[in-house]
């Protein structure tokens, strides 16, 4: 049926984000917000690692047929995430907070244990 692939990708993305939240909590991160949206873009997870704010992009794939998940965090996507992060910081009046951008790449084959790669400081603030 037309459009099913998009729903499958959304479901896979939601599963990946849930896996990422559990993973980050296991590392003692505090989850502050999920799926922050603004006109500039979206941030999957906003967390705190000690005193550092962490803006996390989660990419989940069933396989590497189209490359490893983290390759989907293109320069364009980095700019969108950066703009959304600046918006979030301004809304919370936290512009001076220490922050970084992480990527969590998840390979989640059907009925298999997911492979998780956490890339800290994956990219710098992009304009």
Curated annotation (Swiss-Prot):
It comes from the Bacteria. Coiled coil: none annotated. Gene3D superfamilies: 3.40.1350.10. GO terms for molecular function: nucleic acid binding. InterPro entries: Restrct_endonuc-II-like, tRNA_endonuc-like_dom_sf, UPF0102_YraN-like. HAMAP family: UPF0102 (MF_00048). Belongs to the UPF0102 family. NCBIfam families: PRK12497.1-3, PRK12497.3-3, PRK14675.1, YraN family protein. This is UPF0102 protein Geob_1494. It comes from Geotalea daltonii (strain DSM 22248 / JCM 15807 / FRC-32) (Geobacter daltonii). The lineage of its organism: Bacteria, Pseudomonadati, Thermodesulfobacteriota, Desulfuromonadia, Geobacterales.
């Amino acid at each position: 049926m037309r459009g099913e692939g998009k729903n499958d990708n959304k479901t896979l993305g939601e599963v990946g984000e849930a896996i990422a939240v559990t993973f980050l909590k296991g590392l003692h991160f505090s989850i502050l917000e999920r799926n922050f949206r603004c006109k500039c873009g979206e941030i999957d997870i906003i967390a705190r690692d000690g005193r550092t704010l962490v803006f996390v992009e989660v990419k989940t794939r069933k396989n590497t047929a189209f490359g490893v998940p983290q390759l989907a965090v293109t320069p364009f996507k980095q700019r969108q995430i950066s703009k959304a992060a600046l918006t979030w910081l301004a809304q919370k009046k936290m512009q001076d907070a220490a922050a970084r951008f992480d990527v969590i790449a998840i390979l989640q084959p059907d009925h298999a244990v997911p492979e998780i790669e956490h890339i800290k400081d994956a990219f710098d603030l992009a304009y």
